């Protein structure tokens, strides 16, 4: 399961989306050891990118469990998704291609984003990784049943110690992946531990696509954002006429589970209309970037990984707007995200390392910057990224 750009493990359904994206990235032309297994990869990729299905996904890791309701539709080359958390804080995500709207109904907060096509988000592959099966060996492991459906089982065995093995269950009728386990190293004489699991507990495949349900939600959120823009413009005009020392309405809000918002992130209060679902809209700024152009490079490449994309995101830290650089590296199956932000002694204290399920995190100071590396790989792999990163200017 890949680290989602800008989001933590609590982000709704992203672990499962990352699994589908990884399967979609797997090449079918590389030697997988079995012609039939290569054919299954083709089927899994097609089902993940062009199938219509809805169901409930359960994600378990680190002794905790969460579930998400998933609706996925494809119409031509257009992809539509709706995700709704079934546990904890109520959260909904609506996606049309790269346009993403995240809503916290109980807080009346919406985040409006256009997600860059970095690895690890969505179920549509952005490119094929021809070297993926240079890092993993694909093995067929028989049959099983998942969510009441017959499934073929496959193991992706890493060729080195820099990544984890993964076991996949694919629907025999359509090829859609029904379950994915990330497996830890096997202790001597014991079976491999399951670090985390994402699986459908129930699913309907081949449903009638309903893209309008997603588009209506996006239009409703965008209409609320447009109203807020108009009100902000009116307030700005009236504020110029006010005597010095008067202050207008607060223009910042911390969105639950998201970076703090500020005027730089365009978070504005909406009118107190009880019928409105959204009272606040946050637009985190984001732009594509080039790692070397931003002044960073890896002294040496981590074997099997290549740079898949790079963005700069705006967040608020301790009341101040901060730019965070994110670089995503892929080995064709899993991803590592590397974040760089300005170092602050009041926020960044000692170097640390953490684990939740298969996800490991390494954080450390590098000169005047703070580096965070996250991925579903062993901690030693993340340390290779952190050790190789250097400032060129």
What residues fall within each predicted segment?
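A generic structural motif
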Residues: 107, 116, 157, 183-184, ...
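Bacterial N-terminal signal peptides
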Residues: 15-29
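Gly/Pro-enriched, hydrophobic low-complexity segments
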Residues: 143-228, 355
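N-terminal secretory signal peptides that target proteins for export/translocation
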Residues: 1-13
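Short, solvent-exposed recognition patches
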Residues: 235, 239, 243-367, 377-380
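N-terminal mature ectodomain segment of secretory-pathway/periplasmic proteins
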Residues: 31-106, 134-145, 149-153, 157-185
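Acidic/charged, solvent-exposed loop-and-adjacent secondary-structure segments enriched in E/D, K/R, S/T
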Residues: 102-123
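Short, well-ordered beta-strand elements
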Residues: 178-181, 368-376
């Amino acid at each position: 399961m890949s680290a989602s750009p800008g989001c933590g493990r609590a982000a709704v359904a992203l672990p499962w989306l990352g699994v589908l994206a990884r399967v979609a990235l797997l090449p079918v032309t590389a030697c997988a050891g079995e012609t039939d297994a290569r054919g299954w990869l083709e089927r899994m990729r097609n089902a993940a990118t062009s199938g219509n299905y809805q169901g409930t996904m359960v994600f378990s890791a680190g002794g905790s469990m969460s579930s998400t309701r998933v609706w996925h539709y494809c119409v031509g080359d257009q992809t539509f998704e709706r995700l709704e958390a079934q546990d904890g804080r109520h959260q909904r995500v609506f996606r049309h291609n790269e346009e993403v709207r995240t809503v916290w109904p109980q807080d009346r907060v919406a985040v409006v984003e256009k997600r860059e096509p970095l690895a690890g988000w969505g179920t549509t592959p952005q490119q094929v990784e021809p070297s993926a099966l240079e890092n993993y060996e694909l093995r067929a492991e028989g049959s099983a049943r998942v969510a009441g459906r017959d499934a073929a089982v496959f193991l992706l065995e890493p060729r080195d110690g820099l990544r984890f093995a993964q076991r996949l269950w694919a629907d025999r009728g359509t090829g859609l992946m029904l379950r994915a386990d990330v497996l830890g190293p096997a202790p001597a004489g014991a079976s491999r531990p399951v670090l985390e699991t994402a699986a459908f507990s129930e699913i309907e495949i081949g449903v009638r696509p309903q893209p309008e349900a997603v588009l209506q939600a996006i239009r409703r959120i965008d209409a609320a954002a447009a109203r807020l823009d108009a009100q902000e413009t009116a307030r700005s005009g009236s504020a110029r006429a006010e005597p010095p020392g008067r202050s207008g309405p607060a223009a910042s809000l911390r969105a639950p589970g998201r970076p703090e918002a500020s005027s730089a992130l365009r978070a504005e209060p909406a009118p107190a209309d009880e019928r409105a679902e959204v009272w606040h809209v946050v637009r985190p700024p984001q732009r594509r970037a080039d790692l070397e152009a931003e002044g960073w490079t890896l002294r040496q490449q981590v074997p099997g990984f290549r740079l898949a994309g790079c963005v700069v995101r705006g967040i608020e830290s301790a009341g101040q707007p901060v730019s965070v650089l994110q670089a995503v590296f892929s080995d064709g199956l899993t991803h590592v995200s590397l974040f760089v932000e300005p170092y602050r002694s009041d926020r960044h204290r000692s170097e640390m390392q953490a684990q939740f399920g298969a996800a490991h995190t390494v954080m450390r100071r590098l000169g005047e910057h703070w580096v965070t590396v996250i991925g579903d790989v062993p901690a030693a792999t993340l340390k290779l990224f952190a050790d190789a990163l250097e400032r060129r200017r």
